[in-house]
Amino acid sequence: MRVDGREKTELRHIHIHTNYLKHPEGSVLIEVGDTKVICSATIEERVPPFMRGEGKGWVTAEYAMIPRATEQRTIRESSKGKVTGRTMEIQRLIGRALRAVVDLEALGERTVWIDCDVIQADGGTRTASITGAYVAMVLAFEKLLQAEKVSKIPVKDYLAATSVGIVEEQGVVLDLNYAEDSKADVDMNVIMTGKGQFVEVQGTGEEATFSRAQLNELLDAAEQGIFQLIDMQKEALGDIVSHIE
């Protein structure tokens, strides 16, 4: 039994609140256990200079944490005048993952800005951001469809992410909270599509190694969790799902 009473391959309690903010074209508050992230999607009727004239759109992301998202207050990165390497890595990961399932040609010459703001952190903030951002993005695309600016919702598949790891005597566990993540021998983030295709796998041993058999076990656990997350995304999107499938 894990520190929070879950089974080894059990997700934390997940809730996706849609249309959480008034102004963005799409927004959600995603809760993954005690991790809470607000994800918003903004549609801009232009593309970056390097994309002009190509007839395709672009998806990019920004990621941040409020100062007391963590147990100890952290200084806002805007106060420092630059983002950290960790933040840059995460926002590139979010944008890259979403672009893998967006039909950029069907989107047209538009930019989708994804903003992920962590308001409470208890492990898995980047994977929660990706899972929530996908829903926010599809909600924004539905607005484009309703306005007849696109002929279909420009996504090719679903997308979700979770963490897996090897924690001391527990072995392989799914969806690590902070207490588990901080003592994990192996930590891995996995992003997959609804068709079971991998978008990204990030895995490292923390002063430890892992075998090929353990890698397979980690990926199996992640796949199971991601398919559950995609079912929750579909539930959150409601009737919009009919425009995707």
Swiss-Prot record:
EC annotation from Swiss-Prot or TrEMBL: 2.7.7.56
Xref: Gene3D superfamilies: GHMP Kinase, N-terminal domain
PROSITE patterns associated with the record: RIBONUCLEASE_PH
Keywords, in A-Z order: Nucleotidyltransferase, RNA-binding, rRNA processing, Transferase, tRNA processing, tRNA-binding
BP GO annotations: rRNA catabolic process; rRNA processing; tRNA processing
Domain of life: Bacteria
Keyword Ubl conjugation tagged: no
InterPro entries linked: ExoRNase_PH_dom1 (IPR001247), ExoRNase_PH_dom2 (IPR015847), ExoRNase_PH_dom2_sf (IPR036345), PNPase/RNase_PH_dom_sf (IPR027408), Ribosomal_Su5_D2-typ_SF (IPR020568), RNase_PH (IPR050080), RNase_PH_bac-type (IPR002381), RNase_PH_CS (IPR018336)
Catalytic activity: tRNA(n+1) + phosphate = tRNA(n) + a ribonucleoside 5'-diphosphate
Gene Ontology MF terms: 3'-5'-RNA exonuclease activity; RNA binding; tRNA binding; tRNA nucleotidyltransferase activity
Enzyme class: transferase
Binding site for phosphate: R86, G124, T125, R126
Keyword rRNA processing tagged: yes
Family designation: Belongs to the RNase PH family.
Quaternary data: Homohexameric ring arranged as a trimer of dimers.
NCBIfam families given in the database record: RNasePH
Function as written in the Swiss-Prot or TrEMBL entry: Phosphorolytic 3'-5' exoribonuclease that plays an important role in tRNA 3'-end maturation. Removes nucleotide residues following the 3'-CCA terminus of tRNAs; can also add nucleotides to the ends of RNA molecules by using nucleoside diphosphates as substrates, but this may not be physiologically important. Probably plays a role in initiation of 16S rRNA degradation (leading to ribosome degradation) during starvation.
Protein's name in the database: Ribonuclease PH
Source organism (scientific name): Bacillus cereus (strain ATCC 14579 / DSM 31 / CCUG 7414 / JCM 2152 / NBRC 15305 / NCIMB 9373 / NCTC 2599 / NRRL B-3711)
High-level lineage: Bacteria, Bacillati, Bacillota, Bacilli, Bacillales
